[in-house]
């Protein structure tokens, strides 16, 4: 897709360019093809609610594919508000049975609203520090909560720290009580995005997600700006603000905060995605990758989305970027961004939802980015991971269902609207009339 240049220039100088490219994906080997469809993850038990009841209400707040050491297989976890109270619950999926609620350890509850803040999306990070796979969930309202396949432990600053099966002591003075973002770096769990302390980045003790005391090696790092997102890339943990980017490195067993740039930042928290050995994010000037050069510690930031700049500017100016969901399709070297617009009546139907699809493709002997538009996919959260050797791309919707992308040739039974429009073809002469014939 190239929405930034005029038709005559595209016709003469960029054969194969499209002026409209809706629901087409660029191929790694060149050219375009219509995207595949999506369907309910389970045709019978698609809605995240206990089978035969209405325990769930509202949108799916989060979805994850967890490598569960206890069951010995991957577990799909979805999160949704309770229908009968103001809390939300975690559900796990079982084939042929549907969704079942987890019972949280120590009678923990997860309020939807607390301290004038409301849960809108739940993010997660998985890790294994040597004692099995764990997954940590954050929502920006409640304490982070860690699941090890057996029990759930909330990480609170008022706790003494450490893991105990019978008591919830996880946490310590350096923990953040309402983080919105989470990731893992150098065998530490990192939390940030706490509304009350927006510049704070907290990390656990080494190889211990349950201990957040200074004596054990936990700590906090002030970013110097409101943190939008944190994301590890190679030997650095990048810290994104709206106007600046910094990185955390390790020196002499200490975390060091260094400047990357003070001229650009990230304007959509969930746009930060790692794909094909790079880190991509949405800035006011478009999609930017952080690409490491041959010199250690030297990073180059350059826009890869100039051909669709006008399309992106329209999205940035007119859409709520907090609704943006991003997901990577690794097998296709693709990243997909979904935007769910609203009006005075609330969330719009799927047919009104837009997005951007980007992929790497062979071009001119090298690999470059190509982009297109998405239309007709409404998301409230997204994730992708492997179940066995198969990549599974999931998204939750505002209707409370979990869907699987790359499934079928329709949008859950509806036709896929697709458009591929070329520039006007003048065959090298704009003023000469032509006669077109076909065989």
Task: Give the ranges of each region predicted by the language model.
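Structural signature of WD-repeat beta-propellers
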Residues: 80, 139-140, 193, 240-242, ...
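Carboxylate/His-rich catalytic cores and anion/metal-binding grooves
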Residues: 177-209
């Amino acid at each position: 897709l190239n929405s930034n240049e005029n038709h005559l220039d595209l016709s003469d100088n960029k054969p194969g360019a499209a002026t409209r490219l809706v629901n087409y994906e660029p191929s790694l080997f060149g050219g375009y093809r219509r995207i595949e469809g999506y369907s309910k993850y389970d045709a019978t038990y698609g809605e995240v609610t206990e089978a035969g009841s209405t325990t769930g209400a509202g949108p799916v707040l989060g979805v994850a594919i967890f490598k569960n050491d206890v069951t010995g297989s991957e577990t799909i976890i979805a999160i949704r508000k309770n229908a009968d109270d103001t809390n939300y619950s975690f559900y796990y999926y079982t084939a042929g049975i549907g969704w079942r609620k987890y019972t949280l350890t120590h009678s923990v509850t997860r309020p939807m609203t607390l301290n004038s803040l409301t849960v809108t999306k739940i993010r997660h990070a998985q890790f294994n520090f040597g004692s099995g796979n764990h997954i940590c969930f954050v929502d920006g309202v409640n304490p982070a909560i860690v699941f090890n396949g057996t029990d759930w432990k909330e990480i609170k600053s008022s706790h003494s720290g450490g893991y105990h099966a019978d008591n919830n002591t996880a946490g310590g003075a350096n923990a953040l009580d309402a983080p919105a973002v989470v990731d893992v770096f150098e065998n530490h769990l990192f939390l940030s995005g706490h509304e009350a302390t927006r510049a704070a980045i907290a990390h656990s003790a080494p190889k211990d997600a349950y201990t957040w005391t200074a004596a054990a090696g936990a700590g906090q790092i002030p970013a110097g700006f409101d943190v939008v997102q944190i994301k590890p890339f190679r030997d650095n943990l990048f810290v994104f603000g709206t106007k600046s980017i910094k990185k955390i490195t390790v020196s002499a067993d200490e975390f060091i905060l260094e400047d990357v740039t003070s001229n650009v930042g990230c304007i959509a928290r969930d746009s930060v995605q790692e794909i094909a050995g790079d880190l991509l994010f949405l800035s006011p000037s478009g999609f930017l990758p952080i690409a490491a050069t041959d010199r250690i510690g030297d990073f180059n930031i350059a826009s890869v989305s100039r051909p669709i700049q006008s399309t992106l500017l329209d999205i940035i100016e007119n859409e709520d970027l907090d609704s943006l969901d991003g997901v990577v399709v690794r097998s296709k070297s693709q990243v997909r961004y979904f935007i769910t617009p609203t009006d005075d009546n609330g969330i719009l139907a799927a047919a009104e939802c837009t997005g951007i699809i980007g992929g790497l493709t062979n071009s001119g002997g090298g690999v470059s980015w190509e982009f297109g538009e998405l239309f007709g996919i409404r998301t409230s959260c997204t994730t992708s991971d492997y179940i066995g050797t198969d990549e599974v791309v999931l998204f939750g919707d505002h209707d409370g269902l979990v869907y699987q992308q790359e499934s079928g040739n329709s949008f859950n039974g509806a036709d896929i609207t697709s458009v591929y429009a070329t520039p006007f073809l003048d065959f090298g002469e704009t003023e000469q009339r032509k006669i077109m014939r076909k065989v």
